[in-house]
Swiss-Prot record:
Listed GO biological process terms: DNA-templated transcription
Subunit structure: The RNAP catalytic core consists of 2 alpha, 1 beta, 1 beta' and 1 omega subunit. When a sigma factor is associated with the core the holoenzyme is formed, which can initiate transcription.
Keyword Transcription: yes
Alphabetical list of Gene3D superfamilies matching this protein: 2.40.50.100, 2.40.50.150, 3.90.1100.10, DNA-directed RNA polymerase, beta subunit, external 1 domain, DNA-directed RNA polymerase, subunit 2, domain 6, RNA polymerase alpha subunit dimerisation domain, RNA polymerase Rpb2, domain 2
Family label: Belongs to the RNA polymerase beta chain family.
Protein known as: DNA-directed RNA polymerase subunit beta
A GO MF label: DNA binding
Matches recorded under PANTHER family: DNA-DIRECTED RNA POLYMERASE I SUBUNIT 2 (PTHR20856)
Gene label: rpoB
Keywords, ordered alphabetically: DNA-directed RNA polymerase, Nucleotidyltransferase, Transcription, Transferase
Lineage: Bacteria, Bacillati, Bacillota, Bacilli, Lactobacillales
InterPro entries: DNA-dir_RNA_pol_bsu_ext_1_sf, DNA-dir_RNA_pol_bsu_external_1, DNA-dir_RNA_pol_su2, DNA-dir_RNAP_su2_dom, DNA-dir_RNAP_su2_hyb_sf, RNA_pol_bsu_bac, RNA_pol_bsu_CS, RNA_pol_bsu_protrusion
One GO cellular component, as annotated: DNA-directed RNA polymerase complex
Keyword Disulfide bond attributed: no
């Protein structure tokens, strides 16, 4: 028997074909969300307060200090927040200290700072009753970047940019004349020496002393001449910079000094953040820049006087490590004191070394390092600027290397915590201005923190972020996998990121640093390809937001692969050689072969085993969770694997899902971490269990109660239904499944079913990827899903009196009211069809709505005969189903309702959708198709033992698409079915063809795994043997019920009087310009005329035509279309007198606006509602598909 048994949870054993020993378990798959938010609560929020506070008034007599903050209990529980359309948030109280510096008086007070949304255990937020996710953002890291560019003459120039987290950019560049320039904040360029002089190093010799003598420096000095002899060089430089930054304003050296200080050296205006400081120190550090260079001077220890390194020595890694302590200390440190006119007058400490030029052995080049400023220094220092200039000048000498902006060492992740902190900082900064003004205006003695703090800017900033940011998305809740993928998504879009239109091919492309960090396969098709990615299965963020991936360390001394795990970022990995996870190892952990496959900086090649530093921990570390669920991924073309990974996320939860016979072993962890299942929090014993509640007695005697969710509407309209897995008496351990969620079976993800599939054509019905299906799958509810739709009706106060929910609906027969209760609300369990009343509601009619007789009666009998209008909530088109639940909210019950609303009724209708022709289905290999025919079981082809086939697919769908994995899955699935086992074949480490054929033989199948099939209609065998097996097939969210649409009479647009478009508005089909040409080409003038008039916007014509049809009269001639009238009116609005004449030159009267209005015309308020609904649906669709 090939393979070995592996236990997944307590309910499933699979035969696994993996050969590689897993030394590291998968991390918690949603930790990117939960850990980041926890960091924000623990330290991020405190840092934001400390950044902005203390705040002083303009005269510096009062100061507001931050003391601390505390979160209190949330107002609503999770479930209550969902029901009441509220946010799951906790009130935050901040303690401030107000100090009066004149009297020394201190007032300490706790101030309510608004409700702050709290993350649920599942990594989501409940905002206004809807579950949302904050997508992590992939952005360019702050730091210093160097680049090269070739001009039109083929000359290489260099550039450099310092990018802060917030603040002005500082750029350097060379031109064709070999002069180096600098730009401050994207303004006009000035010679770089001008900035050096402004920093207080004004002499030409001083500049050459710092940077060394080079052609670039000399050319720039010649360009930068002293024009105004009355000014010092520094003052002149300062004025020149000021002129560039503030053109047109009077320039003085003092104003320039304060401007430059604010731009670069003031931590409140310029912030590199911890990551920017780390990146700058790493790039400008002397150790990395000396590596592999030949030193041109003796390196002497300043304390002992001994020669550490002699001139002419190559600075290899070992040499640098031997003097690392001195390099980090005072070795070759020089102190430069700026002149008195400088922007910053403190002494500048630099580390300077002379090395031999790699291009010209007779030349000596100076390398200047920034002497590693402390990590807490968040603003730039003059040393940083001089060291950046030195690196930039060294590039022209062949030293140093340019940066690749798409390298994941230069791109970092802003996760939830950081995005929230940034938003909170924006709110606090707005509040700061407000506080400062109030402190200055009001009397100091009576001021308290509560009086001067206005929290509105802060709460508005947070609300705006959760409500309308591009990164705050409605959770994709089709199934557990789509939830999990959404939480692990990385988007390069959003504020501060890229835009779709500007992003080129390079930024979207797969980069070698994606290995183990970002999935190269799972990304959307379409305009977002490559901009929206997914974290790889083992990916993890470090404290700076760079993605790390784990490796097993190799002990190079004895050449053994250890079980010690090292997490590396992309730029750390560049220094090492990494072997693949499937490298053959001896039992003692040494490499079995002298030469192993490995990679170094993106080169995949063979390396001697002695050179390998690390080994991959797992073959699946390269791919994301959804991709890791595709068996035989290694046999699929990557384009189809992309579709397979994406389509699994669109699977609809079925009534009775089944886990795949052929899985990858990832199904258990994906279901466990998705947040859709109920997981035990502690060890214990089950003391009560039913469909809605499970009670577990802990070992310490306390009781845990787990609530099971039954048929709740998910964000995507599917049924979110959990099923209890444990029974009374069961012992559960922490982390065990208590209940399956939607699309789960026995603690594993189960997106679809395991039908018997044959690759064969059948009467041409599976042309173009279509799927032919057996009626058994319909009758036995194999692919049946439950969908829930929510409808609501509210009563408001109108000018004519309040609306009322009642059973007394005017002009409606008793038949239509049979399922309404005494209040006029539908009963739970009622079966409803399109047009049925769900909530009976009447609205008072206005005077203008009454006829003359009614007005007379009203005048005689007073208020009693006041008429009401029927505004009941009815089942919309396509909303048939069974009433699952009714929720009533009233002020009397203490529910919070919008102003003007007296009562709100929500009705939930459940639909049971069986699979039907037009529904979309797919396998896991990108093999998708639409159901084209459902064939009676007796007509389906059958196996020699009489078993009918369930699905027939077209064999032509395989070769050109190169997704052979589906065929391997088919054969292995049949073997698993025959053996009664489940199989795990992990990606890149699964069943080989030998394993496959051995399992096929074990299952007693034929040696080619094909079989003779018999035609169900004739009983005759088909001519050739057919591949028949079990393939995992899923039903996708694209169902024909949601798409099929037809209209006879419906709403019209108000201005053009043409039918609206789209299913949501019950619109018509657009007959566009090109379709009109087609009818013109055929000369079908009558058809064309009625399409352009009656069927479109000839208001009077369509009324008369309708009347003629109903009365059986001939249809009259059409009139003038409304759109023509709109054109005439638009021309008249331009002052052109335009009239329409008939053939006898008589003027044609055009319809007035208020003429001919009919019930079919959609009024403005209806149109607004329709538009809102359409916008909401469009947004939901966009969020669930476009950003997937």
């Amino acid at each position: 028997m090939a393979g070995h048994d592996v236990q997944y949870g307590k309910h499933r054993t699979r035969r696994s074909f993996s050969r590689i020993k897993e030394v590291l378990d998968l991390p918690n798959l949603i930790e990117i969300q939960t850990d980041s938010f926890q960091d924000f609560l623990d330290s991020g929020l405190k840092e934001v307060f400390e950044d902005v506070l203390p705040i002083s008034n303009f005269t510096d007599t009062m100061e507001l200090e931050f003391v601390g903050y505390e979160f209190k209990e949330p107002k609503y529980t999770l479930e209550e927040a969902r029901i009441h359309d509220a946010s799951y948030s906790a009130p935050i109280f901040v303690t401030f200290r107000l100090i009066n510096k004149e009297t020394g008086e201190i007032k300490t007070q706790e101030v309510f700072f608004g409700d702050f949304p709290i993350m649920t255990e599942m990594g989501t937020f409940i905002i206004n009753g809807g579950e949302r996710i904050i997508v992590s953002q992939l952005v360019r890291s702050p730091g210093v970047y160097f680049n090269d560019k070739v001009d039109k003459n083929g000359k290489v120039g260099y550039g450099s940019t310092v990018i802060p987290n917030r603040g002005a950019w500082l750029e350097l560049e060379t031109d064709s004349k070999d002069i180096a320039y600098t730009r401050i904040d994207r303004t006009r360029k000035i010679p770089f020496t001008t900035l050096v002089r402004a920093l207080g190093f004004s002499g030409d010799d001083e500049i050459i002393d710092i940077f060394g003598d080079s052609e670039l420096v000399r050319n720039t000095i010649e360009k930068d001449i002293h024009k105004n002899q009355s000014d010092s060089r520094t003052d002149e430089a300062l004025k020149e910079i000021y002129e560039r930054l503030r053109p047109g304003e009077p320039k003085t050296a003092d104003s320039s000094r304060s401007l430059l200080t604010a731009r670069f050296f003031d931590a409140r205006r310029y912030d590199l953040a911890a990551v920017g400081r780390y990146k700058i120190n790493k790039k400008l550090n002397i150790k990395t820049r000396l590596l592999n260079q030949i030193i041109a001077e003796n390196l002497i220890d300043s304390e002992t006087g001994e020669i550490l390194v002699e001139a002419g020595t190559e600075m290899t890694r070992s040499v640098i490590e031997s003097i690392e302590e001195q390099l980090d200390g005072d070795l070759n440190k020089f102190v430069y004191t700026p002149n008195d006119y400088a922007v910053v007058t403190e002494p500048v400490i630099l580390q300077k070394f002379k090395v031999v030029s790699p291009v010209d052995p007779d030349r000596v080049v100076t390398i200047v390092g920034n002497a590693n400023p402390d990590d807490k220094v968040r603003a730039l220092t003059p040393a940083d600027i001089l060291a950046e200039m030195s690196y930039f000048l060294n590039l022209a000498e062949g030293l140093g290397k340019v940066d690749d902006i798409d390298h994941l060492g230069n791109r970092r992740i802003r996760a939830v915590g950081e995005l929230l902190a940034n938003q909170f900082r924006i709110g606090l900064a707005r509040m700061e201005r407000n506080v400062r003004e109030r402190m200055s205006v009001q009397d100091n003695d009576v001021l308290t923190p509560q009086q001067i703090i206005n929290i509105r800017p802060v709460t508005a900033a947070v609300k705006e972020f959760f409500g309308s940011s591009q990164l705050s998305q409605f959770m994709d809740q089709h199934n557990p996998l789509s939830e999990l993928s959404h939480k692990r998504r990385l988007s390069a879009l959003g504020p501060g990121g890229l835009t779709r239109d500007r992003a080129g091919y390079e930024v979207r492309d797969v980069h070698y640093t994606h290995y183990g960090r970002m999935c190269p396969i799972e990304t959307p098709e379409g305009p977002n390809i490559g901009l929206i990615n997914n974290l790889s299965s083992f990916g993890h963020l470090n404290k700076y937001g760079f993605i790390q991936t784990p490796y097993r360390k190799v002990d190079r001394v004895i050449g053994r692969v250890t079980n010690e795990i090292v997490w590396l970022t992309a730029d750390e990995e560049d220094e090492f050689t990494v072997a693949q996870a499937n490298s053959k190892l001896n039992p003692d952990g040494t490499f079995a072969e002298e030469i192993v496959m490995g990679r170094h900086q993106g080169n995949n090649q063979e390396f001697p085993a002695s050179q390998v530093d690390f080994v991959d921990v797992s073959p699946k570390q390269v791919v994301a969770v959804a991709t890791a669920c595709i068996p035989f991924l290694e046999n699929d073309d990557s384009n189809r694997a992309l579709m397979g990974a994406n389509m699994q996320r669109q699977a609809v939860p079925l009534i009775d899902p089944k886990a795949p016979y052929v899985g990858t072993g990832m199904e258990y962890q994906a279901a466990h971490d998705s947040g859709a299942a109920v997981i035990a929090q502690h060890n214990g014993k089950v003391v009560f269990s039913d469909a809605e509640r499970v009670e577990v007695r802990r070992e310490d005697g306390s009781l845990d109660v787990y609530h099971i969710t039954k048929f709740r509407r998910s964000n995507s309209g599917t049924a979110y239904n959990q099923r209890t897995l444990v029974k009374i008496g069961d012992i559960v351990e922490k982390g065990d499944f208590i209940a399956d969620g939607p699309s789960m079976e026995k603690g594993e993800m189960a997106l679809g079913q395991n039908p018997i599939v044959a690759y064969m054509t059948w009467e041409g019905y599976n042309f173009e990827d279509a799927v032919i299906m057996s009626e058994r799958l319909v009758k036995e509810d194999v692919y049946t899903s439950v969908h829930l739709e929510e409808f609501e009706s509210e009563t408001r106060d109108t000018k004519l009196g309040p609306e009322e929910i009642t059973r007394e609906v005017p002009n409606v027969g008793e038949e239509a009211l049979k399922d309404l209760d005494e209040m006029g609300i539908i009963r739970i369990g009622a079966e409803v069809k399109e047009g049925d009343i769900l909530v009976g509601k009447v609205t008072p009619k206005g005077e203008k709505d009454l006829s003359a007789e009614e007005r007379l009666l009203h005048a005689i009998f007073g208020d009693k005969s006041r008429e009401v209008r029927d505004t009941s909530l009815r089942v919309p088109h396509g909303g048939d189903g069974i009433v699952r639940d009714v929720k009533i909210f009233t002020r009397a019950n203490g529910d919070e309702l919008q102003s003007g609303v007296n009562m709100l009724v929500r009705v939930y209708i459940a639909q049971k959708r069986k699979i039907k022709v037009g529904d979309k289905m797919a396998g896991r290999h990108g093999n998708k198709g639409v159901v084209s025919r459902i064939v009676p079981v007796e007509d389906m082809p059958y196996l020699p033992d009489g078993t009918p086939v369930d699905i027939m697919l077209n064999p032509l769908g395989v070769p050109s698409r190169m997704n052979i994995g589906q065929v391997m899955e088919l054969h292995l699935g049949m073997a698993a079915r025959n053996l009664g086992i489940h199989i795990a074949t992990p990606v890149f480490d699964g069943a080989t063809s030998e394993d496959l054929w051995e399992t096929v033989r074990e299952a007693g199948m034929d040696s080619d795994a094909k079989t003779v099939l018999y035609d169900g209609r004739t009983g005759e065998p088909f001519d050739n043997r057919v591949s028949v097996g079990v393939m995992y097939m899923i039903k996708l969210h694209h169902m024909v019920d949601d798409k099929l649409h037809a209209r006879s009479v419906g709403p019209y647009s108000l201005v053009t009087q043409q039918p609206l478009g789209g299913k949501a508005q019950f619109g018509g089909q657009r007959f566009g310009e090109m379709e009109v040409w087609a009818l013109e080409a055929y000369g079908a003038s009558n058809v064309l005329q009625e399409i352009l008039t009656y069927k479109s916007d000839d208001v009077n014509g369509r009324l008369k035509a309708y009347e003629a049809i109903t009365k059986g009269k001939p249809i009259p001639k059409p009139g003038v279309p409304e759109s023509f009238r709109v054109l005439v009116k638009e021309l008249q609005s331009l002052g052109l007198d335009m009239r329409v004449l008939d053939e006898d030159d008589n003027e044609v009267e055009l319809r007035d606006l208020d003429e001919g209005e009919d019930d079919d015309v959609m009024h403005v308020d209806d149109l607004e509602k329709a538009r809102e609904k359409q916008a909401q649906e469009t947004q939901e669709i966009a969020e669930s598909t476009e950003d997937n």
